[in-house]
């Protein structure tokens, strides 16, 4: 009985040790590679474990590349993986490029992948051109009419310029700039409506794909809409501004006139005050003249008579004016 227990313990320990060894040494992956025609040593796979590289991430794409007829080095794939690249995507791109008869080397594909580009998508776009649809672009012709233009740009990826080349946003911006320039040079918006292909030809001839990762194949005008009359709106705004300026100047003149009127009223009041002051000096002057003998008593009475006569005439004139005003009102009624 103790021998049986000892034997079971030994078997269990051996099983555990074997499980640990098999989990560390990818024997199954090595056998798969061997039967797939990929020559990779078992110690190479163990070395990947020590370098913290998952062997299936390297061996799987290598098997796929070998079956596709590509001759790739496992060290290059591992180096690309350690650099942070997507080995599977690079291998798929190389296979797609080979099928499409596009000359693409592993080093170039790896550089494109490490640059942050989707190398597989780039190969697919290089084979099957992609259509980029621009948003509605606002442009104004010389007659002041705003035109909304929507374009479709057919592009093909340029493998040689994928690293360092500008992306779709640059293509859209340049096409929009070309449309605005072309429409802005048109004498009338009717010319744009009659010949939309003139926009395509002129924009396409500007070489907008220079320095980008794409090659522009065609630019097609998808839609043209008439928007606002910018010229008339600007004239209306200018007229409104001129009116406000004129109103401001008129208000300024009115304020100056009111101020001048108030100044004149103040001057009149000041003059009246001087008259009253002068009239107050008359009795004093008469008294002084009487005391000094320069004015006789009869002269004084004559002055009093003249003053009384003047007061009476003013009263009669005022009564006559009031009667005339009353008579005029009765006639009006």
UniProtKB/Swiss-Prot annotation:
Localization (cell): Cell membrane; Membrane raft
Membrane topology term: Multi-pass membrane protein
TM spans (from-to): 5-25, 27-47
Superkingdom per UniProt: Bacteria
GO CC aspect terms: membrane raft; plasma membrane
Transmembrane found in the keyword field: yes
InterPro entries: FloA
NCBIfam families: PRK13665.1
Reported function: Found in functional membrane microdomains (FMM) that may be equivalent to eukaryotic membrane rafts. FMMs are highly dynamic and increase in number as cells age. Flotillins are thought to be important factors in membrane fluidity.
Protein name (record): Flotillin-like protein FloA
Taxonomic source organism: Alkaliphilus oremlandii (strain OhILAs) (Clostridium oremlandii (strain OhILAs))
Origin organism lineage: Bacteria, Bacillati, Bacillota, Clostridia, Peptostreptococcales
Name of the encoding gene: floA
């Amino acid at each position: 009985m103790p021998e049986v227990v000892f034997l079971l313990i030994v078997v269990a320990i051996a099983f555990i040790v074997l499980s640990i060894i098999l989990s560390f040494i990818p024997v199954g992956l090595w056998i798969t590679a061997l039967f797939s025609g990929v020559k990779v040593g078992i110690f190479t796979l163990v070395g990947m474990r020590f370098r913290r590289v998952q062997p299936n991430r390297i061996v799987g794409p290598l098997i796929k590349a070998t079956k596709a007829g590509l001759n790739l080095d496992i060290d290059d794939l591992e180096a690309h993986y350690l650099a942070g690249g997507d080995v599977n995507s690079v291998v798929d791109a190389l296979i797609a490029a080979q099928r499409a008869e596009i000359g693409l080397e592993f080093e170039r594909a790896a550089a494109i992948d490490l640059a942050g580009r989707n190398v597989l998508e780039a190969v697919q776009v290089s084979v099957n051109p992609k259509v980029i649809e621009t948003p509605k672009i606002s442009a104004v012709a010389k007659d002041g009419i705003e035109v909304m233009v929507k374009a479709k740009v057919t592009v093909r990826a340029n493998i040689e310029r994928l690293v360092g080349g500008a992306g779709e946003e640059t293509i859209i911006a340049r096409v929009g700039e070309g449309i605005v320039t072309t429409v802005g040079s048109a004498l009338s918006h009717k010319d744009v409506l009659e010949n939309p292909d003139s926009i395509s030809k002129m924009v396409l001839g500007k070489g907008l794909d220079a320095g980008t990762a794409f090659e522009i194949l065609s630019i097609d005008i998808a839609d043209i809409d008439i928007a606002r009359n910018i010229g008339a709106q600007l004239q209306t705004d200018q007229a409104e501004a001129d009116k406000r300026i004129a109103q401001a100047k008129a208000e300024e003149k009115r304020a100056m006139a009111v101020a001048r009127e108030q100044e004149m009223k103040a001057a009149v009041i000041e003059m009246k005050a001087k008259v009253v002051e002068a009239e107050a000096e008359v009795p004093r002057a008469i008294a002084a003249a009487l005391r000094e003998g320069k004015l006789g008593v009869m002269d004084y009475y004559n002055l009093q008579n003249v003053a009384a006569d003047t007061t009476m005439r003013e009263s009669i004139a005022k009564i006559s004016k009031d009667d005339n005003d009353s008579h005029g009102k009765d006639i009006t009624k």
